[in-house]
Amino acid sequence: MASAFKGILIRSPPDVCAETVAKVSQCNRAQLVKNSSTGFKNIFKLSEARKFHAPVASHLRSQAVMAPASDPTSTAIKRVFTFGKGRSEGNKGMKSLLGGKGANLAEMASIGLSVPPGLTISTEACQEYQEHGKQLSAGLWEEILEGLRVIEKDMGSYLGDPSKPLLLSVRSGAAISMPGMMDTVLNLGLNDDVVAGLAAKSGERFAYDSYRRFLDMFGNVVMGISHSSFEEKLEKLKQAKGVKLDTELTASDLKEVVEQYKNVYLEVKGEKFPADPERQLQLAIQAVFDSWDSPRAIKYRNINQITGLKGTAVNIQCMVFGNMGNTSGTGVLFTRNPSTGEKKLYGEFLINAQGEDVVAGIRTPEDLDTMRSCMPEAYKELVENCEILERHYKDMMDIEFTVQENRLWMLQCRSGKRTGKGAVKIAVDLVKEGIVDTYTAIKMVEPQHLDQLLHPQFEDPSAYKDRVIATGLPASPGAAVGQIIFSADEAESWQAQGKSVILVRNETSPEDVGGMHAAIGILTARGGMTSHAAVVAGGWGKCCVSGCSEIRVNDTDKVLLVGDKVISEGDWLSLNGSTGEVILGKVPLSPPALSGDLETFMSWADDIRVLKVMANADTPEDALAARNNGAEGIGLCRTEHMFFASDDRIKTVRKMIMAVTSEQRKVALDQLLPYQRSDFEGIFRAMDGLPVTIRLLDPPLHEFLPEGDVEQIVSELTLETGMAEDEIFSRIEKLSEVNPMLGFRGCRLGISYPELTEMQARAIFQAAVSMSNQGVKVFPEIMVPLVGTPQELGHQVSLIRNVAEKVFSETGSSLSYKVGTMIEIPRAALVADEIAMEAEFFSFGTNDLTQMTFGYSRDDVGKFLPVYLSKGILQSDPFEVLDQKGVGQLIKLATEKGRSARPSLKVGICGEHGGEPSSVAFFAEAGLDYVSCSPFRVPIARLAAAQVV
């Protein structure tokens, strides 16, 4: 210890005076060891060091001996990284270690931009802090003090020195931007002595205004004192002085504010404001680290599925001031317009202000052109810096800057947030300007950006926040404004009268599809992200908010109850399908903004991607919409949806269901055949030259029966079928199932009622031959649902091929076709090699496969899923985002086993996961040939598939 202490004296700067050396020599060795764990602060507090030459104080701090035993971590791993103009110990590629803010500050410094000198404490240091009892280790504190000495040397000013005061800003900065972390602390290092020195140099009003801001910020952010506690004191003083604005307070007034603010610490915390600048810095750093585990931060990470981060970094920089008169100012800007993508600086600027003044809205900011006229040199440098940063980062940048007495300082840069329209234009323009290639441009647009372009959006979401009455699940994106209606029939009737309606139901059923189609938006009290309402609405591109448990739907009285509000039929509601918000009244809408840039951008995505993108479509209209959105075929056509297209069809289906004998059933099926054939012809025509995959009847038969109690159902079926009531009772009893989704459905229907499969196959082949004879290129693919054994599929394939031969013989025409199956039962995935002997293609039905693998009912999962997500038991809704570890492994296994038996096997997926970006990436990496999703998600899937390459 003695030799180490001697080293301090040997390494002291040449201007260390003899008096200082003597003072240090008197230090008690034992006392030094005792206090070393707190960074030498009790021996040479900065308040004492001010008596000596400031460089000596800084030098002593940096060389203070730390007791190794008190630090369980090793300083071999660098944890503090400094930066300043033209030099940096970090770079933009170190975001995981330095956080986004720290990495970008280091990068700006290294390329020669004017960045206030500073240091970044790494995310690994935060991790160590959390793991070691939330204490700053002696070794880390020593590194911080060494970094602080570098800042002091750069600036020629010193923390705690009244004659040359150095003030600091302290900010958090995780690798991913996370609102909910700690707010900024500015002007750290001020106390009664330092503020007097600052006042002598820069004027009393500036100094004491900075001091009162610091007391407020530090108290709120670091000490946990409510901002209102300070604000109350300020407001009372302004009233007493007869002024309204902070800027009207005199220096004398501000001194009074400072004293009152210091009293707040005593009143609220029972302790004095910590005047020691080192202590202030320690507490601020600890507050940033502690904020990583704050409830708000944890909740934010859970909601946004942010995992795998070590913690937050801490950025400490010397303060620069925009509030030092009319040659100073502060601003924020985007290097291009974030809303439109226009290549023009877009931002705001305030003369004689600090950064928080822009954000707080105390003063109205001015356009950047103001800066051009009043600070031409600084503005010119700013424009040059913007061009440098865009070309360096190859992106549109969000920049914060300050001008202090005509000198420009760059405070922060990051990739700028942008709208969908802005994102596409910026990506296209950057390619045209030669800054990025098309591969890079494709990755600059998020799939959610396309959602904005393909659905109507609210013009200004911030304008309606006070009218949000409930929040459900954002089941289908976009926005809808309409009058509420409580029945599907009424929705169709009102829509026929030219009214915009929102269908409100407890939950929807297949029988509601007419009203759902007529409605501009759908709101349900029950159901999840893959409920009937969500799936159907998503397929049509309609706005839907599902599972809104805050509302109570009273169909009888035709009212919607939310808390103490009663909303009646015909009242106006607005829905935000992207956020799940339910808003009272009308909110202005913006139509979808399709443009030439979007077409250009999507053509690049198509050139790059390997995975094909098809669509789920059940009608000719759906098929045409899918094709217009770039679909390369139909991956799923659900024949059961055609049965609900008219009253005649559904009544005929019910006759088929009620039939007791195969002869009776065949009569009803013969009546259905023309309907099915006509629909298939329309779809084949719309998809001329592209494959169409048609799934045979899948849902349980009870779904086609009327809703209501048994007496109502029997009464209605008696009228429709002419059967006696006791016969209908008997038939309904036989159809009744305890668990219909695992019961009499899928291929089990076709095996039990072969005539059903034969009718559907005949309709498909007759339609295909008819269209082919009219010059339409037809590629039908028939898909057998819910297969679990090769024998089930073999039975159905034999029936289908026999019907094909009969139709070809009857018409004298033939064509190529495929027969395959849906893999949606876990057993089918495990024996996929055997099933592939009968199947020419596999299509994974990930909705049912997820349901059966997890053992979750899609219709009931909403009761516990929110709890699972909030507790971190699940990271995401498995019906929305593919479970890659479980369901995904079954898909991989089935694909490998299937192709081992049939190398030419075509493999795809037709569940709702086909339009979810991270799931699409998995399917591409797993070697699937295609994904199929709703028509309105086709562009998103096209982009996601390209981003994988």
UniProtKB/Swiss-Prot annotation:
Binding site for substrate: 638, 695, 824, 845-848
EC category: transferase
Pfam families associated with the record: PEP-utilizers, PEP-utilizers_C, PPDK_N
PTM comment, free text: Phosphorylation of Thr-530 in the dark inactivates the enzyme. Dephosphorylation upon light stimulation reactivates the enzyme.
Keywords: ATP-binding, Chloroplast, Kinase, Magnesium, Metal-binding, Nucleotide-binding, Phosphoprotein, Photosynthesis, Plastid, Transferase, Transit peptide
InterPro entries: ATP_grasp_subdomain_1, PEP-util_enz_mobile_dom, PEP_util_AS, PEP_util_C, PEP_util_CS, Phosphohistidine_dom_sf, PPDK_AMP/ATP-bd, Pyruvate_phosphate_dikinase
Cofactor(s) it depends on: Mg(2+)
Phosphothreonine found at: 530
Active site residues of this protein: 532 (tele-phosphohistidine intermediate), 910 (proton donor)
Main location: plastid
Compartments where located: Plastid, Chloroplast
Disulphide-bonded residues: none
Catalyzed reactions: pyruvate + phosphate + ATP = phosphoenolpyruvate + AMP + diphosphate + H(+)
Entry binding sites for Mg(2+): 824, 848
Transit sequence range: 1-74
Signal peptide per UniProt: none
One GO CC annotation: chloroplast
The enzyme's E.C. designation: 2.7.9.1
GO molecular-function terms, A-Z: ATP binding; kinase activity; metal ion binding; pyruvate, phosphate dikinase activity
Quaternary state and interactors: Homodimer.
Task performed by this protein: Formation of phosphoenolpyruvate, which is the primary acceptor of CO(2) in C4 and some Crassulacean acid metabolism plants.
Misc. remarks from the entry: The reaction takes place in three steps, mediated by a phosphocarrier histidine residue located on the surface of the central domain. The two first partial reactions are catalyzed at an active site located on the N-terminal domain, and the third partial reaction is catalyzed at an active site located on the C-terminal domain. For catalytic turnover, the central domain swivels from the concave surface of the N-terminal domain to that of the C-terminal domain.
Family classification: Belongs to the PEP-utilizing enzyme family.
Protein name in the entry: Pyruvate, phosphate dikinase, chloroplastic
